[in-house]
């Protein structure tokens, strides 16, 4: 799988996905960096079949209306430390991989991973 980590999440998440054999980029790796628009992210996601990882619910509504981004992990943890967030993703990575094989939107909070669409 290929992942794109949104600007409001730590770059370190990319390392976690790469260590598991996936491709991963952070918004800071894109040409416009943090100035990349949501629309540009959606188009890139659709073109390259990227799973967007974000706290931004605008991506959820965009997916409902236009099926963009291609796939989405919606992070619903509120304020969480970087280390705790990385542990949460590491713990849930097998379930995330399995869910995204069949579904297009999953939601991750501190207690569970939910399939949304």
Where are these regions (language model features)?
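Hydrophobic/aromatic beta-strand patches that form the interior of the parallel beta-sheet core
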Residues: 25, 53, 73-75, 106
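Acidic, metal-binding active-site segment of PIN/NYN-like and related structure-specific nucleases
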Residues: 45-63
